[in-house]
Regions:
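N-proximal low-complexity "stem/linker" segments adjacent to membrane-targeting elements
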Residues: 1-29
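Conserved donor NDP-sugar-binding/catalytic core segment of glycosyltransferases
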Residues: 101-134
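A recurrent flexible, glycine/aromatic-enriched loop bordering the glycosyltransferase active site
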Residues: 145-167, 180-182
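Acidic donor-binding loop at a coil-to-helix junction in glycosyltransferase catalytic cores
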Residues: 181-189
Length: 297
């Protein structure tokens, strides 16, 4: 007989064994009956001991560790949802440690609504890796002032902390497999769901912690990959051209800027300063330039 769960947590991973252990420990410490949820982790061919972790991990809740060839985040998550037994899915990441009330909060949100609804929780980024986290050294990824239950735009469909009925995901065909690099596969699904009038609501009590510090230099490099994925998004939804940053002014500035010219050199010097307005401007410019280089090249 297929076990009955209220909610399935789906996580994709690749070479993240140490932090994944912390994440799984977080699900061991949930303030709810362990029989009402399952955790599915889909590994994309890790070589760091993740498979040993799968073999040794024996929690009270149902755990399913799956190993497959690397098909990107979309492939891992689609596989996880396909085997999930529950009618409701949480998508999160292998470096997102859940608050003890994380599962219960998502479950209660879906119990309380009669219509198929998606819920976006709160992910707290950490400025330094320390557990338990210091509240003074965390900040919300979503910084806007939002109210509990507030209806959100599709661009808030962020899969570090989002839940939805499995039936909606299946009806939409899941994450688009064309997105193999960094970013946009989640927002693209969110956009399709909003086109079908599926509501996305804010759930601030559903909290997890992003146990990973990304440096500004890493962000600048990563924005190239983000731009490359945005190019795929543009090909599927050309009506989003301006939302994706391709307004005439930004495109003109990019085309007039040489990657080895004086403007880039100046912005790099400003970015390397310790603080101040020039540092902020330099960092912002390099992030934007990297993103545009990904989407336009």
């Amino acid at each position: 007989m297929t076990p009955t769960f209220e909610i399935s947590v789906v996580i994709g991973t690749f070479n993240q064994a140490p932090v994944l252990q912390r994440v799984l420990d977080g699900y061991t410490n949930q303030n709810c009956d362990p029989g009402i949820f399952e955790v599915i982790v889909v590994d994309s061919g890790s070589t760091d001991g993740t498979h040993d972790l799968f073999a040794q991990f024996a929690p009270r809740f149902k755990f399913n560790g799956i190993i497959q060839d690397n098909q990107g985040k979309s492939g891992a998550r689609n596989r996880g949802v396909a085997v999930a037994c529950a009618p409701v899915i949480i998508i999160t990441d292998a470096d997102m440690i859940p608050h003890p009330d994380f599962i219960e909060t998502h479950i209660q949100a879906h119990r309380s609504t009669a219509n198929p609804t998606c819920f976006e929780g709160v992910t707290l980024n950490m400025t330094e890796l320390h557990w338990p986290p210091d509240p003074n050294k965390t900040y919300p990824y979503i910084r806007e002032s939002l109210k509990n239950g507030q209806k959100l735009g599709w661009y808030y469909f962020l899969t570090g902390n989002v839940s939805f009925p499995k039936s909606l995901f299946v009806a939409e065909g899941g994450f688009d497999m064309d997105f193999l690099g960094y970013g946009w596969e989640d927002l693209e699904l969110g956009y399709r769901l909003q086109q079908k009038k599926v509501p996305l609501r804010f759930l601030p009590a559903a909290i997890n912690y992003h146990y990973h510090v990304v440096s500004e230099d890493d962000e600048i490099k990563r924005n190239v990959k983000k731009g490359e994925s945005a190019r795929i998004m543009l090909s599927k939804h050309p009506e989003l051209k301006w939302f994706l940053g391709l307004n005439p002014l930004s495109v003109l500035i990019y085309k007039l800027t040489s990657p080895h010219g004086s403007l880039i050199k100046t912005m790099t010097k400003w970015h390397q300063k310790k603080s101040g307005l020039r540092k902020q401007v330099g960092t912002w410019f390099l992030k934007e330039y990297s993103y545009l280089s990904g989407i336009l090249n």
